[in-house]
Amino acid sequence: VLLSVTLWEFGVCMIYKDIEEGDYNRSWTGGGVFAAEFHGQDLNDEQAQFYTNFFKNHVFNYLNAEITQKVLPPYYYMVYDYHALYSFGTMQLKSEMSFYTDNLDFWVTCLEGDVNPLTFAQLVRPKTSEDYLMCRGVILKEIFEKAIEVGNIVVPEEFNTGIDYQTEITYKVGYENDDNYYVKRGFPGIMYTTFNFSDLQSVTKINPQTNFLQYINLGMRYTKEEYEALRPSSKYPLVH
């Protein structure tokens, strides 16, 4: 079932029900000692409307066809209680997943789910502005990363002015005043699976494309005032 939110300009079909279990598991991970398979539930009408509004206002509202061409998959599943189930012999462990983007045919977003009976963890739909920021951020950063990879977003030549990608950096607490401290060198840090920055621990883990992506993430994650308070421009001019 295709949602009315689907815009053909983005080339993706948003699907929220009649998803078969096999659809989640076209690619299996694991094997040997343990294996993992993916599960999720269809949305009801109220949930579908909430997800639809979320994608319209917090994802597609920040995109255009030039960015998403060759980036988004044909299908995007919006589901409830998406999780990986790991099997260890006769034992099974559930791991909640808010998104999945490692398949060429489909991606998945899950905004809420059941309580994990073992860990009591639970995905809860966003309510505050900070919640929405984090939810849309993890999706948009994946889209922008892939857009850079396929060439839809090109790093401007002038972006690398003053940034040294060869000399090793420092990152540990207590070295913030060192000239080679990564933020002083023009590296805001690096985002992995969450929408928060981690320390950049080696210059070998960064290149112009990856660093440019981090600046895109930086612009989404913080306001100018928030980042000034966190990383004063008087101390870290290269990241401003």
Which residues fall in each region the model found?
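Acidic/polar, low-complexity intrinsically disordered N-terminal segments immediately downstream
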Residues: 1-65, 232-240
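Short, surface-exposed, charge-dense and proline/glycine-enriched linear segments
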Residues: 16, 22, 27-29, 96-109
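Short loop/turn segments at strand-loop or loop-helix junctions that form parts
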Residues: 28-33, 79-81, 108-113
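Alpha-helix initiation/capping motif
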Residues: 44, 64, 119, 128, ...
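Auxiliary, metal-adjacent structural segments of Zn-dependent hydrolase domains
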Residues: 48-105
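Active-site recognition of the HExxH zinc-binding catalytic motif
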Residues: 104-162
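Metalloprotease/metallohydrolase-associated module, dominated by Zn2+-dependent proteases
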Residues: 163-240
